[in-house]
Structures are given as C-alpha cells and as structure tokens.
Amino acid sequence: MVGSFVFEAELRHQLGKGASRRLRHAGKVPAVLYGGGGEPVSLLLDHHKVVKNLENEATYSHVLTIRFDGREENAILKAVQRHPAKPVVMHLDFQRVSAADKIRVHVPLHFINQESSVGVKKGGVVSHGMVDVEVDCLPKDLPEYIEVDLAQVDIGGIIHLSDLKLPAGVEIHALAQGVGHDLPVASVHAPRTAEGGEGGAG
C-alpha cells in the first residue's frame, strides 16, 4: 500500500516552543506521526511543499506516504494547525494506517446537479448542511469524495446522511450512532420574499 501523495520529512531533534518558533522562521513545519502501534515520531517538513500539498483537496482524504530517515510510512492527515492571522501552517498531525485496519476520515462532499434540480428550477434555493462527512473504511476503500446528487430534490426536500450513495466498504460514522444522528446534508427551500417570509413555488 503506497500513498498517492508523498510528504518528504526529516526527523526533528529540537523540541519545545522556542525550537518550534525558530524552525518555522527557517521555513519548516513541525509535525508528529503517531498511532498504528508505533512510537510517536517528531518530524519536520518544508513549509512551501506542505502548502502546495494542502492546496489539493484530495490530500485530506487519501492515504499519504511519509518519507523520512530512509524509510516510508503510510498515514492519513488528522489535523492541520494554521496561524490565525497569517497564511502559515503551524503544525501537522499524521496518523499511521495499516491495510488491515479501518480508519476514520472526513471526506469532502461534492454537490452535483444543483442548478438543474427540480426545486431550483421552480425558484428554490439550495442550502448545504455540511461540506464533509466522517466515514469508516479500510484504507483501500477510502473515497476521494462523496457525491450528493440534488437533481430530484424538490422545494421542501431534504437529503439526509442515510440518502447518500456510498462506495462499497464505506460506512458513515454518525449513522452507526443511531437514527437520531441521520443529519440533513442538503435541502431546497422556497426563496425568501422581500417581507422576510418564504414565497411559494412558482
């Protein structure tokens, strides 16, 4: 199992806040690789390359290859810490994955056929309840994204998590928690009138 995206890293020997600050000034991003039965490893990555990788949405929902110290490990990106005011990545968390063990990942939702949906053609407005969904699956089954087809949604219609068409081997984590967790993903509602109410379908 080799990840589609490669992150080149080096072992980090200087720890602590002061060291992290110096490393960031030098264009490095501190990171940690943990889980999978192995010891946590502190790493350093090139900030420019990290930013370039993170610009691709698929990075967040793919098994990644982390190269460091002459070896490779497969992982998923679990957390990205960004500076609150600057376009700077402060820290990354990578979680090791095994081909035989299920992983839990947030996968982006891609909404299709919005403009051509039944409700929109009648003047309705699409509202998104979420932009990604947390799934459980084996690494080999991890989808890059999940499509939400709005073509047949009329005004007043709602698509819930249970309505999503999932690839084989993929389960939505929230649905395993019970019926009360079948949250709305998207809906089409009547446009609001000038008075603030909702107009009828035309």
UniProtKB/Swiss-Prot annotation:
It comes from Methylococcus capsulatus (strain ATCC 33009 / NCIMB 11132 / Bath). GO terms for cellular component: cytosolic large ribosomal subunit. One of its GO terms (molecular function) is 5S rRNA binding. The gene is rplY. Part of the 50S ribosomal subunit; part of the 5S rRNA/L5/L18/L25 subcomplex. Contacts the 5S rRNA. Binds to the 5S rRNA independently of L5 and L18. Belongs to the bacterial ribosomal protein bL25 family. CTC subfamily. This is Large ribosomal subunit protein bL25. Signal peptide: none annotated. Keywords: Ribonucleoprotein, Ribosomal protein, RNA-binding, rRNA-binding. It holds the Pfam family Ribosomal_L25p. PANTHER family: RIBOSOMAL PROTEIN L25/GLN-TRNA SYNTHETASE, ANTI-CODON-BINDING DOMAIN-CONTAINING PROTEIN, RIBOSOMAL PROTEIN L25_GLN-TRNA SYNTHETASE, ANTI-CODON-BINDING DOMAIN-CONTAINING PROTEIN. Gene3D superfamilies: Ribosomal protein L25, beta domain (2.170.120.20), Ribosomal Protein L25, Chain P (2.40.240.10). One of its GO terms (biological process) is translation. InterPro entries: Rbsml_bL25/Gln-tRNA_synth_N (IPR020056), Ribosomal_bL25/Gln-tRNA_synth (IPR011035), Ribosomal_bL25_b-dom (IPR020057), Ribosomal_bL25_C (IPR037121), Ribosomal_bL25_long (IPR001021), Ribosomal_bL25_short (IPR020055), Ribosomal_L25_dom (IPR029751), Ribosomal_uL5_bac-type (IPR020930). This is one of the proteins that binds to the 5S RNA in the ribosome where it forms part of the central protuberance.
